[in-house]
Amino acid sequence: LRDYANRVINGGPVEAAGPPA
């Protein structure tokens, strides 16, 4: 969940976020 959480926290779109590994 590191990449997913980081991108969501950074304000990036969830669609562009990596897979919730």
From Swiss-Prot:
Organism superkingdom: Eukaryota
Tissues expressing the protein: Expressed by the venom gland.
GO cellular component: extracellular region
Chief site of localization: secreted
Keywords, comma-separated and alphabetical: Hypotensive agent, Metalloenzyme inhibitor, Metalloprotease inhibitor, Protease inhibitor, Secreted
Keyword Secreted tagged: yes
GO process terms (BP): regulation of blood pressure
Residue ranges of the region described as Disordered: 1-21
A Gene Ontology molecular function term of the record: peptidase inhibitor activity
Subcellular location(s) per record: Secreted
Family: Belongs to the non-disulfide-bridged peptide (NDBP) superfamily. Scorpion BPP (group 1) family.
Task performed by this protein: Inhibits angiotensin-converting enzyme (ACE), but does not serve as substrate for the enzyme. Potentiate bradykinin (BK) on the isolated guinea pig ileum as well as the isolated rat uterus for contraction. Also potentiates in vivo the depressor effect of BK on arterial blood pressure in the normotensive anesthetized rat. Intracerebroventricular injection into mice does not show toxic activity.
Name of the featured protein: Bradykinin-potentiating peptide K12
Organism whose genome encodes this protein: Buthus occitanus (Common European scorpion)
Lineage: Eukaryota, Metazoa, Ecdysozoa, Arthropoda, Chelicerata
